[in-house]
Amino acid sequence: MQYTPFASDIELPFYIALASLKINHDKLDDSARKVLGLYELRPSDAPNASCRIQIHGNALTSDEVPSTYYRAEGMIKNVNTIEEYAKADKMGMLQQSGETIWNAINNGTIYSCPSLLSAFVILSYADLKKYKFHYWFAFPALHSDPSWTPLEEGCEGAQAHRLPSVESSALARSVQEWARVVDAPQRGFFLARRVRMRDDDTVSWKIASLSSYEDGFFKHAEFADCFTCFVDPSNYEEAPGWMLRNLLVLVKRRWGLTKVQILRYRDGPSPRDCGRSIVVTLRLKTSQLPDGGVKDDRMPKVTGWERNPSGKLTGRIVDLTEQLDPKRLADQSVDLNLKLMKWRISPNLDLEKIKGTKCLLLGAGTLGSYVARNLMAWGVRKITFVDNGSVSFSNPVRQPLFNFADCLDGGAKKAYRASQALSEIYPGVESVGHVLAVPMAGHPVLDAEKTKADFEVLKGLIDAHDVIILLMDTRESRWLPTVMGKAAGKIVMNAALGFDTFVVMRHGVTNNEHPEEELGCYFCNDVVAPMNSQKDQTLDQQCTVTRPGVAAIASALLVELLVSLLQHPLGAAAGAPQTPNNTQNDHPLGVIPHQIRGFLSTFENVSVVGRSYKCCSACSRPVIDEYKKNGWNFVQKALNEVGYVEELSGLKEVCHPPLSIA
């Protein structure tokens, strides 16, 4: 007897699901898990393309079997390294799977899950960096010893034959009615008893589960009317499907039979697919049974590893980069390193919170370029730029989002080009640029209508984002966003550069319960309000002259500080440790300083805590309250009237206290 081996047929979405499961759930756990296999009757397929076990995209999570499919019980072991895949005990895996079938036959549990007779195992390794999947299927088949063979020529029932069309149609109807009322694991294997009507020579069928054999389902019936059936996906006329091998072991071991009439059920639900089922009578090849007769307790030999398309006994490799849309590949790959952090190093890291954070970058120059790239590396998807400058020829070597072509024809607008560059790096990012001038303290309003329009756009952007990042060239340009961010309760991050120094900080948020613990802002150490720093400046004073590496260092620290802050349950309200050694063991990324001041001349970083100053020109309560109350009118007055902000905040009184009269 020749059998048609199962062939594996994996849908593309399954690989995506397996990769996602490995990255997000299993991580380093390579324990075997269940996987649902399906097979179906496909009469139109060529014989060599039939008998396929299909692995659908939901095979790892779903237990549902569509009505026209039949269930196969599978296990998958997805190992962690290619070396483990190569060195895995493949014979041991096959033997263990075969032993599961053998034990189920012996103890009778096979009757509750006959689909175990179509069991399979998968050994796999997913190379998630290159999106290559290595896998090898095994379809364990227990050998019958002695083997089964069709009856010799001349014996009654020797020839394999099809049922008459009337009987075949009646059988199909009976099987379909039975299948509707039994569980999915039962549908692939069953018993059929032909009942001949004495009055009119018609035939009807009784269908039952395999367990009914031991309840006397065939009692008093003629051998010719008793059929042990299995749904056969093989389209070969003389080579039944692979699962028959395990069914015959059950017939011999459990029922003690040496002769059986097998019905290869191949009739589909459509009338045009009826009449394809084949009946074959089998007997054990020799009457010389092993010691102990049919009840031989020794486990049979097991075979079943699948051959590759070249006929070699080895696994297969599928390269998804050749099949997936490049944008989808990018979506799957950009977060890979981040998700690997959760495997061992930081399992409590909340990547979704980082991914969903909307960041507004005020400044698209050197700092803005580096900060944007680091935000993308952490998985941030929403990045908005605000800048009113154009790309000059001196920019591309220091600002990695721009190139030489951006300098031509007067230079592209930095905000627009920066957002476009991010989309070129990763199409999944949502980035836009806005060209506008941020109203600056110390710079009187020359065009009230335009300045107000810029203010309204800036206000809308701040309201629409979670994090405001100050990366502008001048001190005074940071004043208004500091006020607006504090009033809106946003996370405000700030980075500023000197020649070989930098400061990176997070601004404090309002703390009504403990105002003495409120953290300060960029302006809390000032004793005067911001003024025009560009007036009467030489060229070296107009440009930001720094050691080239300072911007990259400061930008990286700013993003790392922001991400650490996002992981804290209090968010922007998180306190700052007084000393660097004051670690927070429950935080996935460690301490969250208030300020980091760096000195490249000594290659030192110092963490500093600065409290909110009650007379601060930007974050003091009088300034914030006045802004909330009067909005644009307050801004216009602050820009036009010299000394107004100092007087409102209390700085004027600090610098020039009233003389006491003796």
From Swiss-Prot:
Subunit structure: Homodimer.
Entry similarity comment: Belongs to the ATG7 family.
Role description: E1-like activating enzyme involved in the 2 ubiquitin-like systems required for cytoplasm to vacuole transport (Cvt) and autophagy. Activates atg12 for its conjugation with atg5 and atg8 for its conjugation with phosphatidylethanolamine. Both systems are needed for the atg8 association to Cvt vesicles and autophagosomes membranes. Autophagy is essential for maintenance of amino acid levels and protein synthesis under nitrogen starvation.
Residues in coiled coil: none
Protein origin, superkingdom: Eukaryota
Main subcellular location: cytoplasm
Keyword Transport found: yes
SUPFAM superfamilies from the UniProt entry: Activating enzymes of the ubiquitin-like proteins
A molecular function (GO) term: Atg12 activating enzyme activity
Free-text domain note: The GxGxxG motif is important for the function, possibly through binding with ATP.
Residues at the active site: C543
Phylogenetic lineage: Eukaryota, Fungi, Dikarya, Ascomycota, Pezizomycotina
Any one GO biological process: piecemeal microautophagy of the nucleus
Compartment(s) of residence: Cytoplasm; Preautophagosomal structure
GO CC aspect terms: cytoplasm; phagophore assembly site
Keyword Cytoplasm on entry: yes
Name of the molecule in the record: Ubiquitin-like modifier-activating enzyme atg7
Gene3D superfamilies: NAD(P)-binding Rossmann-like Domain, Ubiquitin-like modifier-activating enzyme ATG7 C-terminal domain, Ubiquitin-like modifier-activating enzyme ATG7 N-terminal domain
Naturally occurring in which organism (per UniProt): Emericella nidulans (strain FGSC A4 / ATCC 38163 / CBS 112.46 / NRRL 194 / M139)
Pfam families linked: ATG7_N, ThiF
Keywords noted in UniProt: Autophagy, Cytoplasm, Protein transport, Transport, Ubl conjugation pathway
PANTHER family: UBIQUITIN-ACTIVATING ENZYME E1 (PTHR10953), UBIQUITIN-LIKE MODIFIER-ACTIVATING ENZYME ATG7 (PTHR10953:SF3)
Residue ranges annotated as motif GXGXXG motif: 363-368
